[in-house]
Amino acid sequence: SFGVPSRDPDEWQPDMQKAIAAAGDGQLLVPSFQGSRVEGMDREAYIADHVTTAHLVTETGAGLMEMNTSCPNEGHNRLLCHDPHLVGEITEAVKNEIGDRPLIVKLAYIPNDTDLEIMVKETVGHGAVQGFSTINTISAKLVDANGNQALPGAGRDRSGVCGNAIRGAGLDMVGRLSAIREKLGLDFAIVGVGGVIRPEDYKAYREAGANAVMSATGAMWDANLAREIKETLR
C-alpha cells in the first residue's frame, strides 16, 4: 500500500508540468488531486483547501483535472463521495476557480442507486462536473492463507484492494451511472476503472457505458497492456 503521499508544490508542480508537456499525439495526462481533511478543520476550510489545490494544478498547464473523493486511506466511513451535498459544494467552488477546464470526480463504489443519482444531480446537474471516473480500490480485511493479518503493522488490518478482484464492482458502477445519465438526460463522461488487466476488460467497460477506460494495477504489471488493447481496435 502506498496511500496518497504528496511533496510540497515547489516539487510536484514542475514535475507535473513536465509530464503534461511530454504527452505525445493521442496522449493526455489527467492530474488528480484532493483536499486535505485536518482534525479541527471546519466545512469552509475543507472546501477552501480543495480550491487552493485545484488552483495549484491549473498553474501546471493542465487542460483538465480529476478530483479524488474516494481515497481509501481516509477510511470507508469517511469517504467524501458518501456526502454528495458536500461534494456538490466543493465542485462548485473548484469549478469557479478552474474555469472552462473539464472537472472529473473520482468515485468509490456506491451501492445505492438513489445516493448515486443524488451525486449526479448535485454535481453535473449544477454544471460543475463534466465526468466521473469510477471505481477506486475497495476497502477489505486482508488475511493470509492461515487467516492472519496479511499486511504488517497496526491499523493495517484493512486495505484498499485493486486489480482483478474489483472489476465486477467497477463494471456495475459504470453501468448504473450510464443508466442514470440516460434517465436524467444529462451529458457527462464516464471513465471506467478497476480490474482492467486484458483487452476483454476494456471492451466490457465500453459496453457498460464508459466513454474511456483507465488501468492502474494492470498497466503496472503489463507495460504492453495499452498497446494490446489498441491492437484489438484496428
Predicted regions: what they are:
Residues 79, 83, 108, 162-166, ...:
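Glycine- and other small-residue-rich loops at beta-strand/loop junctions that grip anionic moieties
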Residues 72-82, 119-120, 124-186, 226-228:
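Glycine/Thr-rich beta-alpha phosphate-binding loop at enzyme active sites
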Residues 6-10, 47, 167-171, 199, ...:
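Electropositive phosphate-/nucleotide-binding environments in soluble metabolic enzymes
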Residues 45-48, 111-126, 179-183, 196-213:
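Catalytic cores of alpha/beta
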